[in-house]
Each structure stands twice: as C-alpha cells, then as structure tokens.
C-alpha cells in the first residue's frame, strides 16, 4: 500500500506536533546563589523585583528591563526604571510592598535582611553580590541564567572588557603610576586594591594607596590617608565639601594642590556600582 503526497504531509504534520507538544516551552532554571541556596524556576521570571542598583542594571542590559515590576529607591538607570514603584533601600525595604508586586523572582544583596522572611513567605529569592571584577562577571552570569538568557552574559562581559581596553589606551603615560585614594563613604570606607574599583584603577595604570591586604572595602583610620599622601583623592561630590575640615587633611599635598576628583552623582553611580556599566566607569 502506498501513500499519496497529501497523506505523507498529514503524517509529517502530526509527527511534528507530537514532538512540539512533548517538549516544554522552557526548561527549568536552577542557579546556586552567593549564599549557597539553590534557586529554581519552572520558567524564566516575568515579574522581577530588584533591590540593588547593580542587579537592576544587570537585568536591563541583559534585555529584561520590561520584566521588572519594582526596584529599590536607589535604582535610577536606565531611565525607564525611575518610573517603577520604589520599595525602600538595603536596610528598610518594605515587605508588604514587595508582596503586593506578586514577584516570581526577588533579586537582592546578601546584606539585605529580608531574604529569609521572603523565602518563608514562599517567594523565590536570589542573593547576589560582587566585590571584585571576577565576581561582577559571575553576577552577570547568574542573573543571565535566572532570566533564561545564559548566552547573553558572555556577550555583555565582552562589551565591558572592550570598554576597559579602550579606556586603558586613552590614559596618558604621565598619568600612569598616580597614587590614588578612592573613598566610598565619608565614614572613611575606601575602595581597596582588591575591590572592583581598585582593580579597575590598577588596569588604568593607577596605584591604590589602600593595598589588597586591607580587603576590598576597609574602614580606615583618618590618619592612614594623611600618612599615605595620595596624589589624587576620588570621592562623591556630596562628600567633598567637608574634606578640608578633617583633622590633618588640609596639610595633604593632594588637598593643597586641588588634586581632588569630586564626582557628580551620575558619574559616581557608574563607578561605584559592581554591575554592567563598569566599562563605562573606566571612561569617567
């Protein structure tokens, strides 16, 4: 017995439909977060709450900005996230407001004390942090996996590396070897040599006066910086005003010579966040 062309066509269509229906639209997603917790999703999340600016920015550069339903108060890039509901900050995120968003994934730092409570209420939570450049790459990789677009992490990291290399090529020879102190807080928390900021400065030819032995973001004695006598002081413009009133700081050569890089908030945000804009930060 032979089949006509139309019969063969119907068989092929049925065979294709069976294959299509037997394969799920999305394979389950499983990622181990930075606290060692296994985060499992049946499908890519569609209602994401991000409680850290670097995580918000990572979601967006990976093409999933439209899946964000709310963020922390400090998330301000890209422009579209400014319009999203704001749920508080690292220490005061509002639990009720988070629940009201009905998120299928909450992204936050392990420093946020809400993680355990959110899990107890049945929410899927991923705790992700980064203190150095390899950890920033790992953060991007894990966020991309959680979003269901794992291949995009490598693409975005290549963009970051390309931007850093371009910035390296722009640094004048005379500027290389500049001894830098980078302040992240007026409470004298500094970006050490082993932090992502410190590693970025090193790649740009600077010498960090806070060596790796002190850790990524150590709290320093005020006298430490005075004794270190950096050639350049970098900090947020909002913190620069009271610099000369610090005991002994008016005697520092960098202060006397005006070698103070007081960054406006928009630039400071780019440089201080361990996320996908670090390539742009190298060019600030």
Regions found by a protein language model. Give the residues of each.
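N-terminal secretory signal peptides that target proteins for export/translocation
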Residues: 1-8
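Short helices/loops that flank or line small-molecule/ion binding pockets
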Residues: 95-103, 121, 220-229
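Short helix-initiation/N-cap motifs at beta->coil->alpha
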Residues: 32-36, 87-96, 131, 213-222
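Alpha-helical, coiled-coil/dimerization segments enriched in small aliphatic residues
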Residues: 74-77, 190-217
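A short, structured surface patch at a secondary-structure boundary
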Residues: 46-101, 105-111, 209
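Extracytoplasmic substrate-binding proteins
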Residues: 28-31, 37-38, 105, 113-189, ...
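A ligand-binding cleft/hinge motif common to bilobed small-molecule-binding domains
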Residues: 112-120, 232-252
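Bacterial N-terminal signal peptides
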Residues: 11-24
């Amino acid at each position: 017995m032979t089949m006509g062309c139309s019969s063969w066509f119907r068989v092929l269509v049925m065979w294709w439909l069976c294959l299509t229906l037997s394969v799920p639209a999305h394979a389950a997603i499983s990622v181990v977060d930075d606290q060692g917790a296994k985060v499992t999703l049946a499908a890519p999340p569609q209602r994401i709450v991000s409680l850290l600016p670097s995580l918000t920015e990572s979601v967006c550069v990976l093409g999933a900005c439209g899946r964000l339903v709310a963020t922390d108060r400090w998330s301000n890039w890209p422009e579209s996230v400014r319009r999203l509901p704001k749920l508080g900050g690292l220490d005061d995120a509002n639990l009720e407001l988070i629940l009201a968003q009905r998120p299928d994934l909450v992204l936050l730092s392990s420093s946020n004390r809400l993680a355990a409570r959110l899990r107890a209420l049945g929410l899927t939570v991923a705790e992700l942090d980064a203190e150095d450049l390899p950890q920033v790459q790992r953060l991007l990789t894990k966020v991309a996996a959680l979003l269901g677009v794992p291949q995009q992490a490598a693409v975005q990291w290549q963009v970051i590396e390309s931007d850093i290399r371009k910035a390296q090529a722009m640094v004048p020879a005379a500027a290389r070897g500049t001894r830098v102190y980078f302040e992240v807080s007026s409470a004298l928390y500094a970006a050490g040599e082993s932090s992502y900021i410190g590693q970025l400065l090193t790649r740009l030819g600077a010498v960090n006066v806070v060596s790796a032995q002190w850790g990524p973001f150590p709290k320093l004695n005020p006298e430490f910086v005075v004794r270190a006598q950096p050639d350049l002081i970098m900090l947020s413009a909002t913190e620069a005003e009271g610099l000369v009133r610090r005991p002994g700081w008016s005697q520092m050569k960098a202060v006397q010579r005006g070698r103070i890089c007081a960054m406006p908030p928009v630039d400071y945000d780019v440089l201080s966040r361990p996320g996908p804009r670090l390539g742009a930060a190298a060019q600030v």
